[in-house]
Structure formats: C-alpha cells, structure tokens
C-alpha cells in the first residue's frame, strides 16, 4: 500500500514530508483492515507530513482531510452532488468515488500524519457494500490525469498550511455537517 511506503520513508529514510503514488496496489487497504481494490488508471496515493505544534490536533484532521479531498473531487465533478460519509468516504451523486485512510505514526518521538487517498477515475469496484461505487469518467464523461488530481491535492494541502493562521475548525465542521451523507 502507498501508506506502507510512506511509513517506510518516514521511519527508514527520515523523510519529513512527501507524496507517493502507484499505478496499482497489491496490498491496498481501507479502514478496519478492508482491502482496497486497485484497478489501473485510478489514483492510489498517500501524502505525509509531521504534526507540528502549530498544526491542528490529529482528531481534527478526520474532518479536514475529507473536506480538502472533496474540494478536489468537486473540481473534477462540477455540478455533481458531493457528499461525505465520515471519516473516510467521498460520494458523488450518492455513490462512493473516493476513500481516505488516515494514519498516525510516531518516529523519533515525532508524530506524522499519513493520508492515503484512493480516487476512482476510470473504473470502480463492484462492491457488495450497501453503497454503490462510481468513477469520475462515468459521472462526468471526463478523464482527468492521475497527476492532475494529485497535483491539485498537493496544492490544496500546501494552501491549507500556508493559511494556517486563519484556520478555524468550526468552518470545516460546518461544511462537513452540510456535506454529510444522510
């Protein structure tokens, strides 16, 4: 999984911040140990960064991450209904299009947040879940490049950290409540 690669980069290579992605994953995973189906042409990536003293606490990132990622999805799925199923799923038109796996690790007495992101771009799994899955191509007839989505995710996190002085959890929480899947 890309989260495992990120963990290795932090622990073994002492990388502070970064992004990794793969064309496919053989050991992709979701929450509660579920496997993440990894069809080529979709996005499988992880970003990671240290949780510095001036950053929001870890638990707030379970609201922040889906908002940041859903804003990116919304960019590619304009005029589509975007919802969130907390803490880790983004839905378009009532169908799951993205999964997020947030992990906290400690390395050299420092906390690091790893955000694993899977976005269905060109295909989606046939799940036995109560939630149907979809992909960007199916919903919009557009096929954005993986790098295009990844670059926007990175830029969105960079903007979040640059604007940290004006960070207000209440803003994220209110938006999250409005986007919650009923």
Language-model segment annotations:
Residues 14-15, 38-40, 85, 109, ...:
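A generic fold-level signal
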Residues 2, 45, 89, 118, ...:
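Residue-level signal for inorganic ion chemistry
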Residues 86, 91-92:
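Glycine- and Gly-Pro-enriched alpha-helical subdomains that act as flexible
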Residues 1-75, 79:
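N-terminal lobe of the biotin/lipoate ligase/transferase fold
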Residues 17, 23, 87, 97-101:
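Conserved beta-strand residues within beta-sheet cores
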